[in-house]
A protein has these predicted regions:
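A Rossmann-like FAD-binding core segment of flavoenzymes
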Residues: 28-30, 75-93, 99, 166-262
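Short hydrophobic core segments
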Residues: 9, 99-109, 150, 229-239, ...
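Beta1-alpha1 glycine-rich phosphate/pyrophosphate-binding loop at the start
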Residues: 2-74, 162-183
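Glycine-rich dinucleotide-binding loop and its adjacent helix/turn
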Residues: 108-166
């Protein structure tokens, strides 16, 4: 008899927590955790905070040590899943191999939203989503250099605080009328603006980026009103896009994220999903929502693990967020 196998696609917070919770819920079959980044799964929230500021090493960010996965018989596989064959209950990997599953969990996360702006491919323009991204930024983050951060959300402001602490001259460009407009009240926006300006960060609102210019590397950020802002380094933080392409190609329901119910089930009863890649209807609010938070990813991972094990659990926690600046 073929042993049961749970395959988890995506080895960030949701995937790693789902794997651990499968064992906690009593899953005795195989557990395979597939990720496209080398090394052990790590926490992403510190990337724009302590890791960028040089206060933490990558080992400090690990969700669990290697011994945990060994003791729990969780197989870590460095590969990219290229296709899901639902009728055969099989996934195709970038290595050329295939892997069958009894239950499949999609924890594919999200990627940094790219700007369609002229000059965006110039050297010195970065996005911040992975540890490798941070290492590139840190290599260029020397005191006295001018960094322009496009986007005044949590990532943009946390990055601003970290780079300011490294002695850089920091300018934040926000297209709307206030920072954190999408996620907080005006009072909170005003608080963060005051804190940043007090630390010497220049906050510019209603600032629309028209283009980036430079000779090989970025030298200026050109605004829609014609103003040019000198820049030695640019960090773009304008949100994320859920990684739903794999699910969509497999015929699963997608609506601003992989659609799941309150038990983390997708439109296929043998496939669950958790984390930033999902959207679900919150009973409290009565509408579908996609949450980009580690707390939500952790809760969904617990529920998804219970569902795989045939137990009833439901996504119910209120969304909450935190930030660490200065």
């Amino acid at each position: 008899m073929t042993p049961e196998r749970a395959v988890i696609v995506g080895a960030s917070h949701a995937g790693a927590q789902l794997a651990a919770n499968l064992r906690r819920e009593g899953w005795s079959g195989e557990v395979v955790l597939i990720g496209d980044e080398r090394g052990l799964p790590y926490h992403r929230p510190p990337l724009s905070k302590g890791y960028l500021a040089g206060k933490n090493g990558l080992d400090d960010l690990l969700i669990r040590g290697a011994d945990f996965y060994e003791k729990q018989h969780i197989r870590l596989l460095n590969a990219t899943v290229e296709a899901i064959h639902r009728s055969a209950k099989r996934v195709s990997l970038s290595t050329g191999d295939t892997l069958t599953y009894t239950k499949l969990a999609l924890c594919t996360g999200a990627r940094a939203r790219r700007l369609p702006t002229p000059g965006v491919d110039l050297r010195g323009i970065h996005y911040l989503r992975t540890a490798a991204d941070v290492e590139l930024i840190r290599a260029a983050a020397t005191p006295g250099r001018r960094v322009v951060i496009v986007g005044g959300g949590y990532i943009g402001l946390e990055t601003a605080a970290s780079l300011c602490s490294l002695g850089m001259n920091v300018t934040v460009l926000e297209a709307t009328e206030r920072v954190l407009e999408r996620v907080t009240a005006p009072e909170v926006s005003a608080f963060y603006t005051r804190i940043h300006r007090g630390e010497g960060v220049e906050i510019r609102t209603h600032a629309l980026v028209e283009a980036f210019s430079g000779n090989g590397g970025v030298q200026e950020v050109v605004l829609a009103d014609g103003e040019s802002i000198p820049a030695d380094l640019v960090i773009v933080g304008v949100g994320v896009v859920p990684n739903t392409e794999l699910a969509s190609a497999a015929g699963l329901s997608v609506d601003n994220g992989i659609v799941i119910d309150d038990q983390a089930r997708t439109s296929d009863p043998d496939i669950v999903a958790a984390g930033d890649c999902t959207s679900h209807t919150m009973a409290r609010y009565g509408w579908r929502i996609r949450l980009e938070s580690v707390s939500s990813a952790g809760e969904q991972a617990k529920v998804a693990a219970a569902t795989i094990c045939g137990k009833h659990s439901a996504i119910a926690a209120l969304p909450w967020f935190w930030s660490d600046q200065y």
